[in-house]
Structures are given as C-alpha cells and as structure tokens.
C-alpha cells in the first residue's frame, strides 16, 4: 500500500499526560559483574534457573513468538507453554473457562496435531525465534494420567486416545492403574496411584509407559525446547516409595537430559508440580535429586500476607517445603490458584486479588536469592491461544523486579520489614521494597545492609539515599520500589497487544513513561510525533487478511526505545444473529433499504461496523418482511 494510504488511515486525538518514570537496566559494576548480563540492554540469564519465567497460559506458539520482543524487554529468561499434547475434546471454541482444563487431559504422547497452541512446526519456529532473543522455552508435560472417558469411571480411558495412540489404547488396561480411589494424602498408594482429576492413572513404573514419555520429551527437544514442567509430579512415584516405588524419575530425566546435552552442550531444566507437600510423610528429597519443585505454600503465604498488610510475615525467609532455594520454584499465584481452587494460604482462588497486590507479592518472591520465580500471565479477556489482555506481566514494576533478579544473581539476601514495608535486600547495593498497605509511601529504614550512597528507584525514577546505614526515599504509586545503582529508560505504552481484530477499524491508545516524546508509524509511512497520550484508529484502508505493522518509539532526549506490533484484520464472519423489522414500521420507508450497524462495545478500544455508511442492502423475506 502507498505511504499516503497509511497516513490517511489514522485518526488522531491527543491528550496531555504527565509522564511517569520507568526504568530498564544498568547496575553498579562493582557489585554485579557486567559480563553476567546478556547484553548492554538486556539482563537475561544463560540458565533457566538463574532467571525468571513467564507462564504464557494458553498462549499459542505463534502468539508467544509475536510477543518475544516485549517478553525479552520485560526481563524474562524463560517462557513456559501450556501442555503440548493433544487435548481431550478439542474444539475451536476460544472460551478459556470451558477449555483450558482439557489441555491437562491429554489423549496422546506426541506434540498435538490440533490444539489452541498450534502445531509442531509452530513450536519449532517459536524456539528458533526465541534463541535470537536469548529466551528459553519450556513446555508443560502431563505424564501422570491420561484423559478419561467418563468422570464417574475414572479408570476408563477416553476412546479418543485410539486415534492418536492405537497401540497404547489396545493395552490401556495394562498401562493404567486398577486402583479405584481418587488421589489424596492418606497413604503412599493413594498419593501415587490415585486418580487425579478423575483421570486414569498411568502405570509409570512400566518401561513402555516411560518410553512413551521419553519419546515425547525428545520430540520437544528436537523442536528446540529447553526444559519441562511436569504436571502432578507429586503423584508420580519415586525410588523411595517402598512397594510402590519405581525408577520413573531416574530413567525419564536421565534420558531427556543426556539427549538435550548431546544436542546442545547445555543442561536441561526440569521442575515438577508438588502442591502443599509430598503427601503421606513422603520427602521432597526423593524428587530434588532429579528435578526442581514448586514451593507453592511459600508464594501463597507471601501473597496472602501482602493483601492483609502483614509485612513482617510476608518476608519470612524460610521455605515452607524445606528444600534448598536452588531447588525451589516460587510464584505469587499460579494458573491453578487463578482458574481453580488450589491456593494454600488464605486464598483458595486468587482471581479476586488485585493486580497491584500480585505485583507486591512478586516483588518479594522474585527478588530472592537462588530460587526461580514463575509469573502467571492472567488471561484477562483473551481467548484460547491469544495473548493476555491483562498486561501486568510486562508492566514497569514487574519488568524492573525481573531485571533486579537477573542482575543480582549470586548476591546475598536479607529479608525484613519496617512498619508496612516489606523488603528484600541483595548484597550491599540493591533492595526491593513492597508497601503492604497502600502505594505511595516515604520510608526510613535502618539495618538493610546497603552501603551509604545515592540510589535510584528504577520503577519511579525517585532517588533514595543511605546515610549512616539508614535508607530514605519515597515509594511511588505502584507500591513497589526497585532500588539500586540503575538508570531509567524511556518506554512507550500501547493499549492493545499484537493479534487480530474484527470490524473495519480498531482504536489504540499510546502513552509514554519516562519519555519526553514518542513516534508511531504504520508500515512504511512517515513517523508521527506525539507527546503525552495519543489515540489512533487503524484499519479503515486495509482489507480482511492484511496485516498492519505499527512501530512505536519513545525517547527522553538521550535514549530511545522501540516496539513493533502487528495486527491482522480478520475476515468478517456471520454471527448467526438475525434482526427482523416489524412490517408496520416499514410503511414510511422508501427503497433501496439499507442497514447500518455501529458497535463500540465489542472490545476495549474496538469499534465494529458491518459496513461503511449507508450500510448493507436488506433482504426481503416474504413471511417476515425485510
């Protein structure tokens, strides 16, 4: 399309907004070795365990790929996908609540041929692209159970398995347990052979079953995957489970790890989901000799205490699982606490907890020494396969916490509190503050261990000072401060993530943080300068199926950052809704008859029109009229 056409497609309305400060990256080289950072403008770590992970819940592989620049800019070393296997009852419905759980009831031991996540080729393409950003991809694996045919008979294998795994289906009675009870913590057998989510439990001590899993892991590694999360790991037996013991973890992890090392020369990262405890007096050490594990009680407790304003208990340094920090995966919330009811400390479900409080809890769990932290990207109004419309995962506060984690790898930690302020100090030159009772706050804290000097809050840009061992400064309106010898970087904000849109046009709102001005341009058009906030409407001169590339920059006069977004205009689809007009109202009408529909409530910032004015020609139905 011609440049003039791109410019004509924009309708611009600007409003003055005072810029707030946002930060992105550097640190005092005397405290943190700059050679440890991925590049001058990146803090990403080389190893999964040293960085922070983004749980791209339900995102398709292509969606993740499209958002890799933003993910890297937000400081995530690793992205975790949803389960890769073929899900039970796959449909094209995008309803998250009705569909997400199907990914945890697999009907195959291969990367899915059809799912909301995409194809095997899509996964490979994602991994190839992620490598360019220094981002690792880990995949969720369901190997404890297989999909059921009937929830009233949890030992019944779904007949859908026959299509994808015919040999397994023939021997399904050999490869699944005969134990009738649901999984619970009352006995070792109930833990490791009970039915999870009313699904048939796999005979994971069987060599053939282990081979199915090992081959799945190798298939993923061949695509470029760098690690795995094992769903329901607690319910798969260990070598120490007596008469129920097996060599599953040894065989599966050794085979996958050696295969990965042969192909890459690096170490494979594996962690397993263990909720609350190992059950029946079993030990975490039976798992940690082979994998890292979730410590959900620690993260759950931090979130609960933050929401209750209990700074002192939110900063309890003890890991509730008792595992070493280097073996622990922490979170502020997970997909199960958000979509389900698995929370362990005050909240069984966390969907009612504000984004603000989740970020405050994240400030504590993600700034700790040696442990790995997982940030759950709340879906917002996104459909299955789509990018989260809740963009907290890449907010300035979360991004700066992530970068702090990355920069201070190896530094000592000190957790503490002062009044309503919880903190995690690292070494002698960095500290993260979380206000458990509000947002803006002036602080005066002694005993943090920080050396005397001046520091910057890389969230708000405010100056902090340590004099005679007392830290003073002001926390900004996020309730979080990330304080070290860092600098700020200009940042452009966009109200709509990359993806597709329906309707003739879509409206975006652009903003600035820590910047004096910015620019935007569509495809090859001339950049348009803006300050404050600006609304632009795109799409009117594009046909369905065409993709619009939007480039947005921000500058503070010294530094400039940029971000690229891609929007595809979708082909209009019939809704199945028909409108009939009462013949009595048609007496005064004159042909030709047209209908014009205008709806600005379809999505935030989106306007739907069935056609340009005067609309579409109406059709005469002899029985009911036009």
Model features per residue range: what roles?
Residues 30-57, 66, 72-73, 162-183:
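N-terminal carbohydrate-binding accessory modules
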Residues 31-50, 65-70, 83-106, 125-135, ...:
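Active-site-proximal helices and loops of the catalytic beta/alpha 8
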């Amino acid at each position: 399309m011609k440049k003039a056409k791109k410019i004509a497609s924009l309708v611009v309305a600007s409003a003055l907004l005072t810029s707030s400060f946002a930060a992105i990256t550097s640190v005092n080289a005397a405290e943190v070795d700059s050679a440890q950072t991925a590049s001058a403008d990146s803090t990403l770590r080389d190893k999964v365990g040293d960085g922070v992970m983004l749980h791209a819940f339900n995102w398709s592989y292509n969606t993740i790929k499209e958002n890799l620049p933003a993910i890297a800019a937000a400081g995530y070393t690793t992205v975790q996908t949803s389960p890769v296997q073929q899900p039970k009852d796959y449909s094209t419905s995008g309803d998250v609540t009705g569909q997400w759980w199907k990914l945890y009831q697999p009907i195959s031991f291969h990367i899915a041929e059809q799912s909301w996540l995409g194809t095997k080729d899509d996964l490979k393409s994602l991994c190839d692209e992620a490598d360019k950003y220094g981002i690792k991809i880990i995949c969720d694996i369901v190997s404890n159970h297989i999909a059921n045919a009937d929830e009233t008979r949890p030992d019944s294998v779904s007949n859908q398995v026959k299509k994808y795994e015919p040999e397994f289906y023939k021997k399904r009675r050999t490869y699944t347990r005969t134990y009738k009870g649901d999984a619970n913590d009352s006995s070792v057998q109930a833990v490791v052979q009970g039915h999870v989510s009313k699904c048939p439990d796999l005979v994971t001590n069987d060599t053939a079953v282990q081979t199915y899993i090992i081959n799945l892991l190798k298939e993923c590694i061949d695509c470029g995957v760098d690690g795995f999360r094992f769903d329901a790991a607690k319910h798969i037996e260990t070598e120490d489970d007596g008469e129920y013991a097996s060599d599953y973890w040894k065989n599966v992890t050794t085979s996958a790890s050696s295969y990965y090392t042969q192909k890459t020369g690096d170490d494979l990262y594996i962690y397993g989901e263990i909720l609350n405890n190992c059950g029946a007096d079993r030990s975490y050490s039976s798992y940690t000799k082979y994998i890292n594990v979730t410590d959900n009680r620690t993260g759950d407790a931090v979130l609960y205490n933050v929401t209750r304003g209990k700074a002192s208990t939110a900063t309890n340094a003890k890991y509730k699982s008792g595992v070493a920090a280097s073996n622990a995966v922490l979170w502020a919330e997970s997909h199960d606490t958000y979509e389900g009811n698995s929370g362990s400390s005050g909240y069984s479900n966390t969907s009612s907890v504000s984004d603000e409080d989740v970020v405050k809890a994240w400030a504590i769990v993600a700034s700790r020494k040696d442990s790995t932290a997982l940030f759950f990207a709340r879906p917002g109004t996104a459909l299955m396969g789509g990018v989260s419309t809740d963009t907290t995962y890449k907010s300035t506060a979360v991004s700066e916490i992530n970068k702090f984690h990355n920069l201070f790898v190896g530094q000592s930690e000190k957790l503490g509190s002062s009044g309503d302020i919880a903190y995690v100090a690292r070494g002698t030159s960095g500290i993260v503050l979380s206000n458990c009772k509000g947002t803006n706050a002036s602080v005066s804290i002694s005993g943090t261990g920080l050396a005397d000097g001046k520091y910057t809050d890389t969230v708000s840009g405010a100056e902090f000072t340590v004099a005679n061992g007392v830290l003073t400064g002001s926390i900004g309106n996020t309730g979080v401060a990330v304080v070290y010898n860092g600098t700020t970087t200009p940042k452009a904000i966009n109200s709509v993530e990359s993806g597709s849109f329906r309707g003739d046009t879509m409206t975006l709102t652009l903003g600035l943080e820590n910047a004096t001005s910015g620019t935007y341009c569509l495809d090859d058009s001339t950049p348009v300068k803006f300050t404050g906030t600006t609304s632009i409407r795109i799409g009117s001169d594009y046909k369905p199926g065409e993709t619009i590339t939007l480039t947005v920059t921000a500058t503070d006069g010294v530094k400039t950052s940029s971000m690229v977004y891609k929007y595809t205009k979708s082909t209009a689809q019939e809704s199945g809704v028909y409108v009939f007009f009462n013949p009595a109202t048609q007496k005064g009408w004159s042909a030709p008859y047209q209908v014009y529909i205008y709806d600005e409530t379809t999505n935030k910032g989106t306007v739907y029109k069935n056609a340009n004015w005067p609309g579409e020609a109406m059709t005469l139905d002899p029985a009911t009229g036009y």
